[in-house]
Amino acid sequence: MKSFFKDIFLTITFFFFIGSICAQSTAVERPRLVVGIMIDGLQQKHLDLLSGYFDPGGFKKITNQGVNLKNLSYNIVSAGNSSDIATVMTGSVPFYHGVVGDKYFNRINDRVQSIIWDDQEIGIGTTETVSAHNLLSSTVLDELTLAFPNKAKSYVVAIDPEEAVMLGGHTAKSVAWIDDVYMKWVTTGYYREGLNRMADEMNVNGGFKTLSTRVWKPLYAIQTYLAASKNSNLAAFEYHPAEKKSKNSSVTILKNTPAANSLVVDLGLKIIEQEKLGADNVPDMIMLQFTVRTPHEKFFSLQSAEKEDMYLRLDKEIQYLLQQIDTKVGLDKTLVFMFGNQTDVHSPTELGENNIPAGYFSANRSMALVNSYLMALYGQEGWITGYYGKNIFLNKQKIEEKKLNFKEVQQAVCDFMLDFEGVQSASPTWQVLGVGGNSQSEMARLRNSVHKNSAGDVIITLLPGWLEVDEKLNPVGESNAIVSYSPFYFYGWQLKPQVVTTPYQVTDIAPTLSRILNIPMPNACIGKPIVEFTTFP
């Protein structure tokens, strides 16, 4: 009998041992840390032009030793960084995820407001009350949090609040962004940790002030900059990040200086070290926003020494960031992805200076003319309630009161808008929302960029070379190209250098990350994993 039980015990032990070996051999391999690098204003052309000036461990390490998605295009219309980032992180488009731009026209109060504004939240260190409530789908960061509840740690360090919230999604442990009035890290009560202790310490111990007050001068002799080849009298520049943007403004130029990037790297590394990101087999994620914008920027191209210097200094910051991550976590255990926003190579100003048709579309005067036209047709009333982001909002209440045919009024506005300089097309919203067929067409991109909750009644598009500007002459979106490409790189972990020439869309990024991390795709994802460099079945 003893021999019988002994045999059973040995048999069970044997199969348990074999099962354990099999489980170990089939265990899913994941990167321990995912680092997302979003660079506002990044252009592939700039990376190529400045390649010879970069250090080997910064941009070059990512671009030369990583995976280059050569033909990655945006399948949405450019309407601001919020929409671009939300599309990257959700693998979906505004038609589903709801983030149609940095701002939108709120029909309830007839105001243009930030896409992240939320009066139900509280600001921490700021009067700004923001949340991700208008982001209607989950992100890849959210799915990571849900896949490993209370284990996966996720943080965001950003320059701007809109970018911070879109990178953080709904479930980031903490996000922080720069307050460029009071010069400190701030956040929103929407995220469970509030202002993380590392950011708070930088505010209190003077670490933020030290970095944010660095005088910005050229990194090298001014004659060595590309801009000097076009201007032999080019003078060295000097900026103080605490100086005001304009005479009557309380806002500083901090966010458009290298100091902003230094602050992001410093806090990001503090979080990685003190929160022990990447220390175990449960993947963690940190998203970082940088910029290559300069004070008072008018051009998208490399026409200034300041623009070059932003790139050169950011290159050194990225080199330091990667070196520290390699020391603390190991780049072989870290997946890095780097991307920019939609932006044209040349601004309308540059195109115009070279006799290429281009211009800026300003809504204020245009909407006044549209209203005058409708008054001539239907009577002396306020027929237009608002406009933003190529969306025209009609006074539905007044149209109903006058018992007018709504579609007839819509069509009248469409017909009139076609006479405006810079306008390519004008369509009733119901027509745009019903567009089907070729997903690569211009109208499909327009449909992708509209959400029923925030859409106007008439939607216009602009001619090539034209950009919309708001009442302060700030661009609403930065690209009007029919097909908009953006640099995108993956680096680190198990990836080998590769150039992927297969056409992909930006909605394919989130499912690719999900596949690498072996987690569910975001719940509104319409993209597909990029198979060229993902090894999972």
Language model feature labels by segment:
Residues 24-67:
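Active-site-proximal N-terminal segment of extracellular/periplasmic enzymes that hydrolyze or transfer
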Residues 364-405, 475-517, 531-536:
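Substrate-binding rim/cap in mid-to-C-terminal beta-strand-loop elements of soluble/periplasmic
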Residues 92-93, 101-282, 291-298, 421-425:
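His/Asp/Glu-rich, glycine-adjacent segments
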Residues 43-49, 72-74, 126-132, 251-258, ...:
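Second-shell loop/turn segments in exported
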Residues 54, 80, 102-129, 137, ...:
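Secreted, luminal/periplasmic, and some membrane-associated catalytic domains
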Residues 46, 254-280, 293-334, 513:
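A long, amphipathic alpha-helix that forms part
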Residues 69-89, 156-164, 289-291, 335, ...:
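Short, solvent-exposed turn/loop segments enriched in Gly/Ser/Thr/Pro and often Arg
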